[in-house]
Amino acid sequence: MSEQDYLYWSAKNLINAFKSKKLSPLEVTKECLSRAKKIQNECNAFTEYFDQIALEQAKIAENSYLGKTHEPRLLEGISLAIKEEFALNNSHRSSGSKIFKDRVDSFTDVYIQRLLDGGSIPIFKTTTPEFCLLGTTWSDLHGVTTNPWNKKYTPGGSSGGSGVALATGSCAIASGSDIGGSIRIPAAACGVFGYKPPYGRNPEVPYGNLDYYSHS
């Protein structure tokens, strides 16, 4: 099965392939990491990679589908890109600002933890403009993120790195946040599905978000 055949599959199709043993979570995770590192030179969409934990979690997922451990969870083995404004234990969270370039979190946001508890695998963090306050994705800290379909254009913002990750097949699902279009603009610009859930459906994080306008 070629790289093109499965890196663009939906999470549902990947899970079905894992269950039927047509695909291995470990194989897919390795390919996602490889793809992301190739794409980085072209689009500059990623800020941090989690190779070790991703491969460890992928092996756990693989054993689950082989019936060696626990029952597969809802998102077992599904690769997850995390927007850089969200906290993941032992990872950097600058929100695109030099002010917080050295901040490393000792906790994981509830929104992300729920995805991890469902079996998803964190593989990297994605770029965002400074404090997520632009409809494009660039910052003095991380530079300019470009659209994978045309490098002269933006992928939108502020979840532009996540949009690129999905559009390039570097992950199956990606986190984002949306006040004035920060999920919807990258989805439109990159040609992927983006959903802004109703207020209250997800925990309100990060804590600086703007009350009823904030949806993760």
Q: What annotation goes with each model-predicted range?
A:
Residues 2-179:
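Gly/Ser-rich catalytic/binding loops embedded in alpha/beta enzyme cores
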